Amino acid sequence: MAKEWVAVAYEEDFFVGQIEKKLANKVRVTFLEQKKDIFFSWPKRKDRADIKPAFIFCRNLEVLQEKDNYIVKHLTELRQKFEGFSSKYFSQNN
């Protein structure tokens, strides 16, 4: 069974990864590292976190593999979705 590609929001930016495991109230996600433009790869040291599903702002991403690189399709639209999510959930009321 293929692992689901997701985009996870943090306050400053978002990260693309795969859901590895579903836990009680969280999911374990292993993240890619952005190299240049639309190109990503697995970091030398595994980057994983247990996160609340509420921080997944986009599911079933289209990610293509080319040798050791991964290409995240529609990255511009994904960034726009993140900016909308971020302004709604992370912006501080002054």
Where are these regions (language model features)?
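Extended catalytic cores and adjacent scaffolds of nucleotide/polyanion-binding enzymes
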Residues: 1
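Short beta-strand-centered aromatic/proline hotspots
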Residues: 4, 13-22
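A short beta-strand micro-motif
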Residues: 4-10, 29
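Epigenetic mark-reader domains in eukaryotic nuclear proteins
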Residues: 27-94
